[in-house]
Curated annotation (Swiss-Prot):
Listed PROSITE patterns: SUI1
GO terms for MF: ribosomal small subunit binding; RNA binding; translation initiation factor activity
Organism (species): Anopheles gambiae (African malaria mosquito)
Keyword Protein biosynthesis appears in the UniProt entry: yes
Keywords: Protein biosynthesis, Translation regulation
GO CC, alphabetical: eukaryotic 43S preinitiation complex
Gene Ontology terms: biological process: regulation of translation
Name of this chain's protein: Eukaryotic translation initiation factor eIF1
Length: 110
């Protein structure tokens, strides 16, 4: 009898599956990553390079009362990281601020 629940979960795995999930496809991918215990990270990938991501993170931190940063991912470029489950908040905020249309947002996670 083997234990099947010890597999690792890669939140970026579905972005690697096919060529249609390219950074240039116009989609903004919003993912959630499990850290330790109840702690989670929300990552946002695919925002246009013309936006200053540090200013976006600063506004999100103030709006959602959470911590955040911009990390440089080797495959996906600059990715926003926010602490906590901010998937719904970031979707509403991106559409309200005009940074992305609702049909451009693709939410991944549990």
């Amino acid at each position: 009898m083997s234990i099947q629940n010890l597999n690792t979960f890669d939140p970026f795995a579905d972005a690697i599956k096919g060529a249609d999930y390219d950074v240039q496809d116009g989609l903004v991918h919003i993912r959630i990553q499990q850290r330790n215990g109840r702690k989670t990270l929300t990552t946002v990938q695919g925002l246009s390079a013309e936006y200053d991501l540090k200013k976006i993170v600063r506004a999100c931190k103030k709006e959602f009362a959470c911590n955040g940063t911009v990390i440089e991912h080797p495959e996906y470029g600059e990715v926003l990281q926010l602490q906590g489950d901010q998937r719904e908040n970031i979707c509403q905020w991106l559409t309200k601020s005009g940074l992305a249309k609702p049909e451009q947002l693709k939410v991944h996670g549990f």
